[in-house]
Amino acid sequence: MKKISVFTSIRSEYGLFSPLWLALKANNSFKLELLVGGAHLVEEYGNTISFIEADGFSIAYKLPFLYKGEDPDALTRSLSTLQLQIGKYFMENKPDLLMILGDRFELLPVVLAATLNKVPIAHISGGETTEGAIDNQ
């Protein structure tokens, strides 16, 4: 059985990812492990982890990495925390594949940790412009 880890951090990914998650969950050849963090775990962003759980998905690992604020210090602390958390997950769980969606800046520490742990990465989508996003300034 192949262990497929999927990282998600914002509500907008859920609608795009969920059909794939359902297919993986239904296939006995795969073990789906959801790595949920960021805005999904924050009340002011809707605590959207509850939507994922309500649809019957179990969460393998919660990643509470967001520091309050969007200044360079808060962003640096957030991304550093995420890299430590997800790096630990990769070392302990050794997934066969990591799936990510989009091109948000919080994916940088995720893919770096996966690369350092020799976890292959499946990248879905990217390149869209999000007004005001740090990578589009």
Task: Give the role of each language-model region.
Residues 1-40:
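N-terminal subdomain of nucleotide-sugar transferases
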Residues 7-8, 14-23, 65-137:
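Active-site and donor-binding regions of nucleotide-sugar-utilizing enzymes
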Residues 31-75, 85:
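Conserved nucleotide-sugar phosphate-binding/catalytic loop shared by glycosyltransferases and other
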